[in-house]
Amino acid sequence: MKKLDVQIAIEADGWPDEAELEALSTRILDHAADFIAAEGQPFAPMPAEVSLVFTGDTEIQAINSEWRGQDKPTNVLSFPAYPIEPGDKPGPMLGDIVIARQTVEREAAELEKTITDHLTHLMVHGFLHLFGYDHMTEDEAEEMEGLETRILAGLGLSDPYAGQVPV
């Protein structure tokens, strides 16, 4: 059964075309959904809707300032439709993931990764936030980063946290 209905909106220049982003987003999020379902995450009986907004630094800075009180651009923001904890059954609307192109490009260059690989990581990261995963504490970060790493491995990508010193 299809678990997700992935909707995308492109709100800034410089992103790949809509068909390419939709295919990439669907492949990544379907894989992530299948992975967490195999780990025991329940899903609604109908496909759950998740929206991805591909924007730029100016737009995400305004959103980040309004919703998080941080007046600076960031790579990805997630807005769950309903607050849930990991393992809770979500409703038919998962929420929104907003990604900023310039920050993704800058970070990919700094990390010496392709833009697609870094974008894939950020999509998975944002998707897990919609299921209540977080990284505010060391234990939460360990759980979330472990899931991200295993999901990304299934997509053929290496551990994005390898070599980082824990905070």
Curated annotation (Swiss-Prot):
Enzyme Commission number(s) of this protein: 3.1.-.-
Listed GO CC annotations: cytoplasm
Entries under Pfam families matching the protein: YbeY
MF annotations from Gene Ontology: metalloendopeptidase activity; RNA endonuclease activity; zinc ion binding
Cofactors: Zn(2+)
Record text on cofactor binding: Binds 1 zinc ion.
Keyword Nuclease: yes
GO biological process: rRNA processing
Alphabetized UniProt keyword annotations: Cytoplasm, Endonuclease, Hydrolase, Metal-binding, Nuclease, Ribosome biogenesis, rRNA processing, Zinc
Record's keyword annotation contains rRNA processing: yes
InterPro entries linked: MetalPrtase_cat_dom_sf_prd, YbeY, YbeY_CS
Residues annotated to bind Zn(2+): 125, 129, 135
Location(s) in or outside the cell: Cytoplasm
Function noted in UniProt: Single strand-specific metallo-endoribonuclease involved in late-stage 70S ribosome quality control and in maturation of the 3' terminus of the 16S rRNA.
Family listed: Belongs to the endoribonuclease YbeY family.
Name of the protein described by the UniProt record: Endoribonuclease YbeY
Organism: Allorhizobium ampelinum (strain ATCC BAA-846 / DSM 112012 / S4)
Upper classification of the organism: Bacteria, Pseudomonadati, Pseudomonadota, Alphaproteobacteria, Hyphomicrobiales
Chain's gene name: ybeY
